[in-house]
Curated annotation (Swiss-Prot):
Annotated protein name in UniProt: Imidazole glycerol phosphate synthase subunit HisF
Organism: Parabacteroides distasonis (strain ATCC 8503 / DSM 20701 / CIP 104284 / JCM 5825 / NCTC 11152)
Pfam families, alphabetized: His_biosynth
Single Gene Ontology BP annotation: L-histidine biosynthetic process
Compartment(s) of residence: Cytoplasm
Signal peptide region: none
GO function term, MF aspect, one: lyase activity
Quaternary context: Heterodimer of HisH and HisF.
Cited function: IGPS catalyzes the conversion of PRFAR and glutamine to IGP, AICAR and glutamate. The HisF subunit catalyzes the cyclization activity that produces IGP and AICAR from PRFAR using the ammonia provided by the HisH subunit.
Record SUPFAM superfamilies: Ribulose-phoshate binding barrel
Pathway, per record: Amino-acid biosynthesis; L-histidine biosynthesis; L-histidine from 5-phospho-alpha-D-ribose 1-diphosphate: step 5/9
Catalyzed chemical reaction(s): 5-[(5-phospho-1-deoxy-D-ribulos-1-ylimino)methylamino]-1-(5-phospho-beta-D-ribosyl)imidazole-4-carboxamide + L-glutamine = D-erythro-1-(imidazol-4-yl)glycerol 3-phosphate + 5-amino-1-(5-phospho-beta-D-ribosyl)imidazole-4-carboxamide + L-glutamate + H(+)
Main location class: cytoplasm
Active site (UniProt): 11, 130
Amino acid sequence: MLAKRIVPCLDIKDGKTVKGINFVNFRDAGDPVELGAQYSREGADELVYLDITASHEGRKTFTELVKQVAAHISIPFTVGGGINELKDVDRLLSAGADKVSINSAALRNPALIEEIAKNFGSQVCVVAIDANFENNDWLCYLNGGRVPTDKYLFQWASEAESRGAGEILFTSMTHDGVKDGYANDALATLADTLHIPVIASGGAGKMEHFRDTFSNGKAGAALAASVFHFGEIRISDLKQYLKDEGINVRI
């Protein structure tokens, strides 16, 4: 059985990590390379860097950052934000990223998934889905959760897989930031429906939440941000806890 992965996520704006961070001894608390290196040392399996700057200037800054991350960090990392066409993918992979995450662009143009898979391989293509539980179903949203679509989580995830996605990164908008645990029922349904790994996102508040999303939610990986950035959970402690709970993780 594949080892379960712990994946810190860093939101990047103008080259800086934007969620407040209070690790001690950081010369620059917002330095995403420094932070990524710290997580790597603590035992993170992968990293996700999301570019939340929309400007052309921001894109260039982000590409430079990807080069820096690739030069300093040995674990795989995924980049997302503002990826709309193949040349964006090419630029970021050439800068050193291992995978790209597409969200709104895939909903607007599902053929982009096939293009990425065909040109770079399915393993490069992570389809991120933001969905909110409403009227007894999981509705997918665009633009960072601001614009509702006519797509629903399970059918869209299946379509993404059939088009060549290598992984699904599912963020529950219902659970995000609440720190009350992941959307494990929906995650388990996804895991049973799909043949590719599912990354759980949204809801991590304590170590038990990671255990539950791996055992009950059947997630292949768990992504979190603030619990790591604010030092509430150390990754090395989390890994040991999960191992003690019988979850297969790399220590």
